[in-house]
């Protein structure tokens, strides 16, 4: 298993002139597969952050009973999800391939989603497995991004 090593480089900027949405609207057409994720926890403002993720390096998706790894060297691996090799094994195997060091490296993780249909991998609940040509999104998709813009609304700063 090949190990991918990365080191973070960060810069802090004053964030009171920019909003996550306005910044995302400026960069979304330049960087395909970009993502905007905003905090919805309004109880503790010290942890209220928004993220814009740009330029995917690698991804892991779970779909139709198969884990698919897309790695930084453009290789692709497929692993069937079974009782012996579960979703959590696939996610841990994928995550273990990456080592990120440096300031704010704790932000460099996997960003993505888990759809409702992913319940079939964790509980004994039947879910209709449909394949649609127009919208066949994976049940789970998590991406490691090259660039992150982190908005800390509590401190009015951008990383």
Segments and roles (model prediction):
Residues 1-159:
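Signature of the chorismate-utilizing enzyme
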């Amino acid at each position: 298993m090949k190990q991918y090593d990365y080191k973070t480089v960060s810069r802090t900027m004053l964030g009171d002139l920019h909003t996550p949405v306005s910044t995302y609207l400026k960069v979304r057409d330049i960087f395909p597969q970009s993502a905007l994720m905003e905090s919805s926890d309004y109880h503790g403002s010290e942890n209220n952050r928004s993220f814009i993720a740009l330029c995917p390096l690698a991804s892991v998706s779970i779909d139709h009973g198969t884990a698919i790894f897309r790695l930084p060297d453009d290789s692709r691996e497929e692993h069937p999800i079974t009782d012996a090799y579960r979703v959590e094994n696939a996610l841990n195997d994928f995550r273990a391939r990456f080592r990120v060091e440096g300031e704010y490296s704790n932000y460099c993780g996997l960003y993505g989603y888990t759809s409702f249909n992913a319940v079939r991998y964790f509980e004994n609940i039947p879910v209709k497995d449909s394949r649609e040509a127009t919208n066949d999104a994976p049940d789970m998709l998590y991406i490691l991004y090259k660039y992150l813009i982190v908005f800390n609304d509590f401190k009015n700063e951008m990383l």
